[in-house]
Amino acid sequence: MVSSAAFESLDPQKIVRCLEGTRVDVLGQLRRWIDEENGGDSTTPNAPVFWINGSAGTGKTMLAYTFADECRRRGIPVTSFFCSRYFAERSNPNLIFTSIAHHLAQTFPSFGVRLAEVLRSNPHLASASVPYQLEELIINPLRSTHDSFRLCLIVTDALDECKDEGTTSIILSSLSRYVSEISPLKILVTSRLEQSITSVFASRSGHLNAASQRLVLHELELGVV
């Protein structure tokens, strides 16, 4: 578990929030998305995954931090992993699902009980493959405690800053396999347009293509604040 990767642990002096009156359209899209019940069609605002991508300096982390903090203030539970190439733990993609599972266990007691049972029976999951981590640490506990869950936002920011592009692609491919089962969780992903990431979202054979909304920030720079 990497507590330093959660948005609450980030130094607010180093993360600039969106100023009032800026990014109004983008934040409005995110608010509409979080307030809609999960669906699975990218043509509607209720897809369970929202992918914000763009070139360097377009404000992806600023938006992710601002929206996560806004949801927290609204009483929506937020679990987050802010990747950073400058910190070893925050650039290790193998720690993303373990950290998210830990945060979910702290937020939802029934999930925590089930997760503890899983870890007692298999204490080596922290070193398991990423797909197996997702299934055992998040999906299976979620299946058995679904009725006790409510809306929760999961933020994975700057996914492209993970040090292993191959594992980054595996993370998204694994998520694609289970995306129809994550309700009432909603997942916000931000990244640059790296091939290892865009290929998974664009794949017609996976489920992320049809279960995600997308926003390309650098295409909005001239016309949208």
Regions found by a protein language model. Give the residues of each.
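Conserved NB-ARC/NACHT P-loop NTPase core of NLR-like innate immune receptors
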Residues: 1-225
